[in-house]
């Protein structure tokens, strides 16, 4: 099996996804992750795939409620779900990421591939082509539990205690999820134990990601201090230097500048893609800090 070639998104936010069997603990991990990131000041969007548009459709409900699927071509349902994921990704997830939000998704495109392959459609190429339009998660968690554990958890829900579950399919799905995770740069999490243990593993990976996206306030303070003092740092060559920041770093830099300059930036100055060089920092400082940087030569 080849890897899904998902598209690296251009947003300043984070995309975190959770996939796995029904009963693997996705809902609990999403709840705990959201609470953890909210305490850290993240603006969140919680979502799921496929969306209710598909889940409420007649073909989806009929297929899910029947034990006998002989009269249904699963590929048609998968195509419906895939088109829904494209629409949802382009018009819900990407805009949120570009607004700097952290998006947490219950299931993702990986689930579409896993379900298709688990049902025997292993030669279909169309799903790989569609994947190239789907934003790649910053963290893709695959929660792994033994099939019997997952089924027992599902059966413990009052509303689903009598639900028909195709056990053979669940074993195939688990195998596909594990393989997709390994080939797509996902993070396999053992979710068989208590939720506290599972979340500790999830939180560790989140913290590792956040640590790679440092707060820029210290660097901003040092740079502006040198600029205000008329240091040689203000030479044109220095001002032309690329700050070397990714989109998240630029957003952090803007927020730090607003706080440092005690100013509320105009919307046009909040665009992180306009903040590339030290000279761009100077221009903002001159605009919002009055005479403190008036003698600094901007590029």
Language-model features, listed with the residues they occupy:
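Conserved lysine of the Walker
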Residues: 26
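Hydrophobic anchor at the beta1->P-loop junction of P-loop NTPases
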Residues: 18
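Phosphopantetheine-dependent thiolation modules in NRPS/PKS and related acyl-activating systems
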Residues: 211-245, 249, 254, 259-299
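ATP-dependent small-molecule kinase phosphotransfer cores
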Residues: 42-121, 125-129
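Hydrophobic positions on the alpha1 helix immediately C-terminal to the Walker A/P-loop
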Residues: 29
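A glycine- and Lys/Arg-enriched "phosphate-lid" helix/loop adjacent to the NTP-binding pocket
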Residues: 112-175
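NTP-dependent small-molecule kinase module
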Residues: 2-9, 32-34, 148-215
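P-loop (Walker A) phosphate-binding loop of NTP-binding proteins
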Residues: 21
């Amino acid at each position: 099996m080849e890897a899904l070639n998902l598209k690296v998104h251009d947003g300043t936010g984070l995309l975190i996804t959770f996939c796995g069997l029904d009963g693997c603990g996705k809902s609990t991990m999403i709840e705990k992750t959201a609470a953890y990131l909210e305490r850290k000041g993240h603006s969140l969007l919680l979502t799921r795939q496929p969306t209710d548009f598909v889940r409420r459709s007649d073909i989806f409900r009929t297929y899910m409620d029947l034990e006998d699927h002989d009269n249904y071509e699963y590929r048609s349902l998968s195509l419906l779900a895939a088109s829904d994921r494209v629409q949802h990704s382009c018009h819900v997830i990407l805009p949120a990421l570009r607004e700097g939000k952290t998006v947490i998704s219950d299931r993702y495109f990986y689930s579409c591939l896993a379900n298709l392959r688990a049902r025997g459609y292993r030669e279909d190429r169309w799903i790989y082509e569609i994947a190239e339009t789907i934003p790649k998660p910053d963290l893709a968690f695959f929660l792994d539990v033994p099939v019997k554990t997952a089924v027992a958890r599902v059966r413990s829900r009052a509303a689903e205690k009598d639900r028909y579950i195709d056990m053979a399919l669940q074993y195939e799905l688990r195998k596909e999820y594990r393989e997709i995770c390994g080939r797509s740069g996902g993070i396999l999490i053992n979710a068989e134990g208590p939720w506290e243990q599972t979340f500790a593993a999830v939180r560790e990976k989140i913290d590792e990601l956040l640590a790679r996206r440092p707060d820029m306030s210290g660097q901003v303070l040092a740079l502006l201090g040198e600029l205000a003092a008329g240091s040689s740092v203000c030479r044109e060559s220095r001002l032309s230097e690329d700050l070397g920041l990714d989109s998240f770093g630029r957003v952090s830099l803007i927020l730090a500048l607003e706080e440092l300059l005690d100013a509320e930036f105009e919307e046009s100055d909040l665009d992180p893609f306009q903040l590339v060089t030290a000279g761009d920092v100077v221009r903002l400082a001159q605009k919002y800090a009055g005479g403190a940087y008036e003698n600094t030569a901007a590029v």
